[in-house]
Amino acid sequence: MNDNREQLTQQIIDAGRFLYGRGWSPATSSNYSARLDEQRALLTVSGKHKGQLGFDDVLATDLAGNSLEPGKKPSAETLLHTQLYAWNPAIGAVLHTHSVNATVLSRLVRGDRLVLQDYELQKAFAGVTTHEGQVEVPIFDNDQDIARLASRVQPWLEAHPHCPGYLIRGHGLYTWGARMSDALRQVEAFEFLFECELKVLSLSR
């Protein structure tokens, strides 16, 4: 294992412990990745507890989502990670989480997007410099056919190059960043904002 791969793998392991500890990636849910180079990514293998990841629980894939390590099975949602690396060369890490807030809010919001507006913490997202604008978070219906789901995500990405993340209804959040620390920051910001939105909804009933 070269130094770069070892460092990125450790970042994935550390992310898993942090996200599990916050209750945002329970049990074997969720998946995480980091860009290894222009043609490859490192991803968590299928079915592993994210708070207990080890070095053997991360594998390399190509950007088509194919495992480059015989005997290791990538997550079923690998294509949703590699799609992002192919879409934007600046993305260095992708995190998919299954928090209660993301899961419930995605079911409550009517329509195909959540609009975040006038929150100071919107500035935690890459490229956002003021609370005064809107951050649109698309919500895609869950689909066990990942290639079909990816085909629905792609047009949104192309039309919204500064999109910081998206939700899958009743499922969870995808967000990303140039580095793992950036992706983790965005998860934390999303979780705060999702909780705010849920409280607003509950108080307005």
Curated annotation (Swiss-Prot):
Catalysed reactions listed for this entry: 5-(methylsulfanyl)-D-ribulose 1-phosphate = 5-methylsulfanyl-2,3-dioxopentyl phosphate + H2O
Cofactor note: Binds 1 zinc ion per subunit.
Molecular function in Gene Ontology: methylthioribulose 1-phosphate dehydratase activity; zinc ion binding
Pathway assignment: Amino-acid biosynthesis; L-methionine biosynthesis via salvage pathway; L-methionine from S-methyl-5-thio-alpha-D-ribose 1-phosphate: step 2/6
InterPro entries, per database record: Aldolase_II/adducin_N, Aldolase_II/adducin_N_sf, MethylthioRu-1-P_deHdtase_MtnB
EC number: 4.2.1.109
CC cofactor: Zn(2+)
Function: Catalyzes the dehydration of methylthioribulose-1-phosphate (MTRu-1-P) into 2,3-diketo-5-methylthiopentyl-1-phosphate (DK-MTP-1-P).
Protein name: Methylthioribulose-1-phosphate dehydratase
Highest classification ranks of the organism: Bacteria, Pseudomonadati, Pseudomonadota, Gammaproteobacteria, Pseudomonadales
Gene behind this protein: mtnB
